[in-house]
């Protein structure tokens, strides 16, 4: 059984596990916390690369993996049950000190109040899921080569609730979903989550009445089963008679986990020969009939299998939904780390122990490896060792696990026997073993007990059988068995040949390098790992065996296709001699016209689809040993240069993590033949640019050309680029176009260009946005250095590849491409509520006005900023983002942080497709200009189901904090308070002025509040209830201080109550402080002022003129009879809208269903001209409510932004907030 550990997504999910194979950290329940507090605390351990809190015990016993898993399943179910109930807040407070989990960059604080369930699927272990887009018309999964979809059909990321969504092409709901992926990646975990979620009523209840889960390796133990017996095995508790269950087959879901594990052939039978559902038949025949739709053709199925096993599974599987599990994102790897060690509540390990080693962090993308690494650290803690892991491969990590787990060399003989058992099981495709199997192999009773205790073996609770803790662990032991056998063989060549024959027979030559056993075997043939094996088994291995076995497995290098499996094997081996010999012998042409291996060779350009950080790491590692001169990591929508052959193009449809960037750039430190690197179209963070420039400064880096077009670079990145240019870098050509460098950034580049050590000869920049002074400076540089050419136009040799009929790459000029695509550079005028991005403004949709929920659909990769909210997103692809306005009081109340931290910005509940957002800028209102606030005091608070997490932002700017590679939950900026400073924190504040006309009298309301969009919106809505309209006036220029008081005064005799305002923070749900000002006659105008009460200096002044008092969009409440009628915006401008709206049909589409019925919609559309349509629409609007007119205004704003802005400006510039 291939099962993996999955960790909880920290923004919205709590891990659920119920399998013998699930490997997940234990979660603390309330009862466990009470029990933990009652324990006495021993003295702390010495601090050696380990941050220990008082109370950590080094005497904790080894817990078998099976026991740990059962405990985790119990705790996970309690977490699910607990999430459905609202805990009593006072009960938590009465328990005393709230336990805390610390790491260097994050702090987790258990809840002191219940967290409401934000959405249905928050309790799931978070795994990255890629739904593949298979070639149209394909009716079989079997292909000449088994590879993810071709580059043009990359697929898209989905969530667990989307597994059975309709196909985008056919709109049909799938009956067959295949969950595929690499070994240990989390396929079985996902399958069990689906079953568990259905049991809990959280998933697919509207589609399936019965869901049955089957472990295929356990089913394979049965000789024969009837359909009725199969259904009975798939239910923990019988829910209905079999006849009743089978009466509605379209409401049934069968989950077959690990269908590729048993050594069976699933053959469909003749439908005419199908037996009755109560009659037994061979299990493989029964399952084959289910898959072939000979029985229950209307039922749905979900299969899990390794990707490489699918082509030989069955002859045909129709057109399934194929979903690939890609493992953990970088954030979830970190989250898993401290969740794992949460079971030792008083122990915390600095995550930098792992995070500072990017290779280790990348390996942890695979959940099983993540568990393995944490287990090694835990064993080191228990044995009192210094915590340190230097493993660069999964093989090395497995050996480390073995050396820490096996108690001494006295078990070496039994360990050999266990390896033989593993190899025999792999060859026979067996993962379950009886007690007699173990004894026949030569395992003693005490050895079996020891292996069970340390967690290498586990006993199956449903039978008397045994298995390895994970299938990957069995494959690792099998690999060791082949090393041990060959070392004992008298005739080494014969032993090598037999080993290779066995592996080819088991996996096939085509998939040989995809098999984990082969990868482990190559890893064990590394010199360092063989020495480690010698220590474990207390023996010596002849080095001749190693070399001959390597040659036997790899074969002739020039006969091997260049694909991911071989790259993985070479990476595991790490031997420079083998890498060089193999990589330099690769052919540069395709082996045939139909050859679509993981790479496609075309005109000396290798193409490779990579989906994960692990794949990117192994490929770039191997490339450095090859003839490849040019490397392109293809970003979406990028324009491209012609690469110098031989070249390789990597296609990647999922986000690249920070750790992966570090590994990639680390591999560039010694590039051998690589001279060109194109990263255009890939968003690069500040830290990624720093890693890149560090690599370019290394003497072994031979890169001469670097393209960074449209990579989201800012002026902050230019300091690294300038330093790199000044450090004797070999770089001769640098392209930085389509980046927001600004004058400051370009000036920093100029400093690097002036350095005599700079070898750059071509620099491409966007100069249109630069000031004349900076452009002059650039021209002066060119004049001073004749070898330097600075350009801002695309060079003639820059081309974009297209496919011709022969499948070869043809080159099209960018000018021709632009002519074909037409003029797409018209930028529509937008408003402050829109998100401004590469293509202009993107409208924000109102999802639920009462709940303050909004949605924006960002159309392409790039950077987007909303002036109204201050939010800023950097996205890698088109994505829909939902934004909710929250109140801190709902989450922060009564936590310890309310005394140690202050709110520093608005709180948002953001939801977005996982991995699509590489950075988010969260606004704050703390003033940094005076240098009185240390930016290290800023934290971003995430409110999650298991508590609140404080994360340190990547950087803090004057108006926002930047969080890179974020996961989303209710989140906002907090500032840690320093006792000596108290509450005297400089604040960026705003003044809000509202007025209402009543006959000739005017009432003003004046607010002084922090610059928080959620507070502003709450005040807008409150004032709107009483027909008050806001006037836009400039805010105070200087920073103000929380707790300070200010005197309100006027240039005329008016009544002001109260006459003092205090600047304070109040949650949006609380009443805000304001002064009410009564004016009998405004005359020519009135001057309002705010003066600091303590120092008597003027901090704000505004002139209110009669022209400011033009009504716009007040909500019509029960106005007095004598009050002037305040018309809605659309009614005020009816004549202009009828005359100037030029595109009515898109407007009607937005109103359809919200305001217009189907009949109204068709009636308006039937009119002949746009003006007649608008008149008809206005005639119907007489019966509309104010909310309907609000929808009308919003639709006009989205379809005709120029017109609406023009009307707003002519009406006096009164702010409109809907």
Swiss-Prot record:
Identify the residues that the record assigns to the NACHT domain, covering every copy. Answer: 175-484
Residues of the region (ZU5) are 835-968
- Enzyme Commission number, as recorded: 3.4.-.-
Q: Where are the LRR repeats?
A: 343-364, 673-693, 730-750
Q: What class of enzyme is it?
A: hydrolase
Q: Where does ATP bind?
A: 181-188
Any one GO BP annotation for this protein: protein homooligomerization
Among the GO molecular function terms of this UniProt record, one is: peptidase activity
Q: Where is this site: Trigger for autolytic processing?
A: 942
Q: Which UniProt keywords apply?
A: ATP-binding, Cytoplasm, Hydrolase, Immunity, Inflammasome, Inflammatory response, Innate immunity, Leucine-rich repeat, Necrosis, Nucleotide-binding, Nucleus, Protease, Repeat, Ubl conjugation
Domain CARD span(s) in chain numbering: 1122-1211
Q: Where is the composition biased (Polar residues)?
A: 7-29, 799-815
Start and end residues of each FIIND domain: 835-1118
Q: Name one GO cellular component term.
A: NLRP1 inflammasome complex
Query: What Gene3D superfamilies does the annotation carry?
Result: Death Domain, Fas, P-loop containing nucleotide triphosphate hydrolases, Ribonuclease Inhibitor
Annotated region Disordered: where?
1-61, 799-842
Q: Where is this region: UPA?
A: 969-1118
Q: Does the keyword Ion transport apply?
A: no
UniProt activity-regulation remark: Activated by cleavage by B.anthracis lethal toxin (LT) endopeptidase. Cleavage by LT promotes ubiquitination and degradation of the N-terminal part, releasing the cleaved C-terminal part of the protein (NACHT, LRR and PYD domains-containing protein 1a, C-terminus), which polymerizes and forms the Nlrp1a inflammasome. Nlrp1a inflammasome is inhibited by DPP8 and DPP9, which sequester the C-terminal fragment of Nlrp1a (NACHT, LRR and PYD domains-containing protein 1a, C-terminus) in a ternary complex, thereby preventing Nlrp1a oligomerization and activation.
Enumerate the subcellular locations listed in this protein's record, separating them with semicolons. Cytoplasm, Cytosol; Cytoplasm; Nucleus
Q: What is known of its domains?
A: The leucine-rich repeat (LRR) domain may be involved in autoinhibition in the absence of activating signal, possibly through intramolecular interaction with the NACHT domain. The FIIND (domain with function to find) region is involved in homomerization, but not in CASP1-binding. Autocatalytic cleavage in this region occurs constitutively, prior to activation signals, and is required for inflammasome activity (IL1B release), possibly by facilitating CASP1 binding. Both N- and C-terminal fragments remain associated.
Describe its assembly.
Answer: Interacts (via LRR repeats) with BCL2 and BCL2L1 (via the loop between motifs BH4 and BH3). Interacts with NOD2; this interaction is enhanced in the presence of muramyl dipeptide (MDP) and increases IL1B release. Interacts with EIF2AK2/PKR; this interaction requires EIF2AK2 activity, is accompanied by EIF2AK2 autophosphorylation and promotes inflammasome assembly in response to danger-associated signals. Interacts with MEFV; this interaction targets Nlrp1a to degradation by autophagy, hence preventing excessive IL1B- and IL18-mediated inflammation.
Q: What does this protein do?
A: Acts as the sensor component of the Nlrp1a inflammasome, which mediates inflammasome activation in response to various pathogen-associated signals, leading to subsequent pyroptosis. Inflammasomes are supramolecular complexes that assemble in the cytosol in response to pathogens and other damage-associated signals and play critical roles in innate immunity and inflammation.
Give the protein family: Belongs to the NLRP family.
Q: What is this protein called?
A: NACHT, LRR and PYD domains-containing protein 1 allele 2
């Amino acid at each position: 059984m291939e099962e993996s550990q999955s960790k909880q997504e920290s923004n919205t999910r709590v891990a659920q596990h119920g399998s013998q194979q699930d490997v997940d950290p234990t979660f603390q329940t309330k009862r466990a916390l009470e029990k933990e507090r009652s324990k006495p605390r021993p003295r702390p351990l010495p601090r050696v690369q380990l941050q220990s809190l008082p109370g950590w015990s080094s005497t904790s016993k080894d817990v078998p993996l099976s026991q740990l898993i059962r405990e985790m399943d119990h705790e996970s179910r309690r977490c699910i049950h607990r999430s459905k109930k609202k805990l009593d807040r006072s009960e938590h407070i009465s328990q005393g000190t709230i336990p805390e989990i610390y790491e260097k960059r994050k702090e987790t604080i258990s809840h002191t109040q219940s967290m409401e369930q934000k959405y249905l699927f928050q309790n799931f272990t978070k795994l990255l899921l890629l739904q593949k887009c298979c070639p149209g018309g394909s009716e079989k999964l079997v292909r000449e080569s088994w590879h993810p979809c071709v580059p043009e059909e990359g697929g898209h990321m989905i969530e667990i609730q989307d597994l059975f969504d309709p196909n985008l092409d056919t709109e049909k709901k799938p009956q067959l979903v295949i969950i595929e992926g690499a070994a240990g990646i989390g396929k079985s975990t996902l399958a069990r989550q689906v079953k568990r979620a259905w049991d809990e009523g959280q998933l697919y209840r509207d589609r399936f009445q019965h869901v049955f889960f089957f472990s295929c390796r356990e089913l394979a133990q049965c000789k024969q089963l009837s359909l009725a017996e199969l259904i009975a095995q798939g239910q923990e508790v019988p829910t209905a008679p079999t006849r009743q269950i089978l009466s509605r087959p379209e409401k049934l879901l069968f989950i077959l986990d690990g269908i590729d594990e048993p050594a069976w052939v699933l053959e469909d039978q003749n439908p005419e020969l199908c037996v009755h559902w109560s009659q037994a038949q061979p299990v493989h025949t029964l399952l084959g009939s289910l898959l072939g739709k000979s029985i229950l053709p209307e039922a749905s199925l979900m299969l899990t299998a390794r990707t490489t096993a699918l082509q030989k599974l069955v002859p045909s599987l129709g057109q399934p939904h194929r979903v690939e599990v890609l493992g953990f994102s970088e954030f979830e790897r970190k989250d898993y780390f401290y969740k794992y060690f949460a079971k030792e509540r008083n122990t915390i390990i600095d995550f930098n122990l792992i995070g500072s080693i990017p290779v280790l962090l990348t390996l942890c993308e695979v959940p099983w490896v993540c568990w393995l690494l944490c287990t090694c650290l835990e064993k080191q803690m228990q044995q009192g060792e210094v915590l340190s892991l230097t493993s660069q491969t999964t093989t090395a990590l497995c050996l480390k696990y073995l050396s820490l787990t096996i108690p001494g060399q006295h078990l070496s003989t039994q360990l050999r026997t266990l390896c033989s058992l593993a190899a025999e099981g792999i060859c026979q495709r067996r993962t379950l073993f009886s007690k007699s199997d173990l004894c026949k192999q030569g395992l003693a009773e005490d050895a079996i007990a020891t292996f069970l205790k340390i967690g290498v073996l586990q006993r199956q609770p449903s039978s008397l059988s045994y298995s390895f803790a994970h299938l990957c662990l069995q494959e690792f032991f099998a690999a060791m068995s082949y090393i041990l056998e060959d070392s004992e063989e008298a005739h080494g060549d014969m032993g090598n040949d037999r080993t290779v024959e066995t592996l080819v027979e088991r996996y096939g030559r085509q998939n040989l390098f995809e098999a984990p056993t082969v990868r482990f075997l190559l890893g064990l043939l590394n010199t360092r790992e063989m020495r480690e094996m010698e220590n474990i088994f207390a023996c010596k291995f002849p080095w001749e065996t190693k070399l001959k076995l390597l040659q036997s497995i790899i074969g002739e290098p020039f006969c091997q296709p260049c694909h991911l499996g071989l790259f993985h094997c070479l990476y595991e081996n790490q031997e420079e001699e083998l890498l060089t010999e193999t990589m330099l012998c690769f052919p540069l042409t395709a082996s045939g016209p139909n050859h679509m291996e993981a790479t496609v060779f075309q005109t000396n350009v290798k193409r490779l689809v990579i989906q994960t950080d692990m794949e990117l790491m192994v490929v770039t590692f191997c490339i450095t040993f090859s003839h490849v001169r040019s490397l392109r990591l293809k970003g979406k929508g990028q324009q491209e240069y012609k690469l110098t052959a031989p070249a390789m193009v990597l296609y990647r449809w999922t986000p690249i993590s920070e750790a992966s960037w570090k590994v990639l750039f680390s591999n560039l430190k010694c590039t051998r033949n690589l001279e060109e690197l194109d990263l255009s179209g890939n968003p690069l963070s500040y830290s990624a640019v720093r890693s890149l420039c560090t690599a370019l400064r290394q003497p072994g880096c031979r890169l001469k050309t670097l393209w960074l077009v449209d990579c989201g670079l800012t002026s902050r990145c230019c300091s690294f680029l300038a330093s790199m240019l000044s450090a004797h870098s070999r770089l001769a050509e640098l392209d930085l176009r389509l980046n927001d460098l600004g004058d400051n950034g370009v000036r920093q580049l100029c400093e690097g260009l002036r350095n005599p050590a700079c070898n750059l000869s071509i620099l491409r920049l966007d100069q249109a946005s630069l000031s004349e002074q900076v452009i002059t400076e650039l021209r002066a540089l060119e004049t001073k250095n004749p070898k330097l050419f600075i350009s801002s136009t695309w060079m003639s040799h820059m081309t974009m590849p297209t496919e011709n009929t022969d499948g070869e790459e043809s080159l099209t000029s960018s000018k021709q491409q632009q002519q074909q695509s037409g003029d797409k550079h018209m930028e529509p005028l937008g408003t402050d509520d829109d998100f401004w991005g590469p293509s202009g403004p993107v409208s924000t949709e109102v999802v639920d006005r009462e709940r303050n929920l909004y949605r924006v659909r960002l159309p392409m990769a790039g950077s987007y900023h909303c002036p109204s909210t201050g939010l800023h997103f950097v996205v890698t692809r088109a994505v829909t983002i939902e934004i909710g306005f929250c109140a801190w009081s709902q989450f922060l109340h009564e936590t310890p942080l309310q005394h140690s931290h202050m709110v520093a910005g608005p709180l948002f509940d953001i939801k977005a497709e996982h991995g699509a957002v590489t950075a988010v800028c969260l606004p704050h209102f703390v003033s940094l200009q005076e240098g009185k606030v240390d930016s290290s005091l800023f934290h971003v608070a995430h409110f999650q189901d298991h508590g609140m997490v404080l994360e340190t932002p990547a950087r803090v700017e004057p108006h926002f904090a930047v969080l890179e590679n974020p996961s989303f939950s209710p989140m906002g900026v907090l500032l840690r308070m320093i006792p000596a400073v108290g509450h005297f924190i400089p604040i960026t504040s705003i003044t809000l002025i509202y007025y209402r006309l009543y006959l000739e009298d005017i009432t003003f309301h004046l607010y002084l509040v922090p610059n928080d969009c959620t507070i502003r919106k709450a005040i807008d809505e409150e004032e709107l209830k009483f027909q008050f309209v806001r006037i836009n006036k400039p805010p105070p220029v200087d920073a103000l201080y929380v707790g300070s008081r200010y005197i309100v005064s006027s240039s005329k005799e008016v009544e002001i109550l109260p006459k003092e305002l205090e600047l304070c923070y109040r949650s949006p749900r609380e009443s805000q402080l304001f002064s009410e000002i009564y004016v009998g006659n405004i005359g020519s105008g009135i001057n309002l002022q705010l003066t600091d009460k303590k120092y008597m200096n003027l901090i704000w002044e505004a002139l209110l003129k009669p022209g400011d008092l033009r009504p716009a969009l007040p909500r019509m409440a029960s106005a007095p009879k004598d009050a002037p009628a305040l018309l809605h915006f659309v009614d005020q401008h009816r004549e202009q809208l009828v005359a100037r709206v030029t595109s009515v049909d898109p407007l009607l589409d937005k109103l359809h269903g919200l305001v217009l019925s189907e009949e109204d919609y068709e009636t308006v559309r039937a009119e002949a001209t746009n003006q007649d349509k608008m008149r008809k629409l206005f005639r119907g609007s007489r019966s509309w409510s104010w909310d309907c007119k609000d929808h009308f205004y919003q639709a006009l704003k989205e379809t005709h932004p120029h017109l609406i802005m023009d009307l707003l400006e002519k009406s006096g510039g009164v702010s409109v907030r809907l």
